[in-house]
């Protein structure tokens, strides 16, 4: 059983991590496609 505060913190962390990964991937793709 998870407590609401724990679940909320987990979702916030997951969202932040997902955004961070998307930014990193975007930068890597842009730098990789640069001719």
Swiss-Prot record:
Where it sits in the cell: the answer is: Membrane
Primary localisation category: membrane
Alphabetical GO CC annotations of the entry are: membrane
Record keywords: Membrane, Transmembrane, Transmembrane helix
Q: What membrane topology is given?
A: Single-pass membrane protein
InterPro entries under this entry? YoaI-like
Q: Which parts of the chain span the membrane according to its record?
A: 10-30
NCBIfam families documented for this protein? membrane_YoaI (NF041475)
What is the name of this protein?
Answer: Uncharacterized protein YoaI
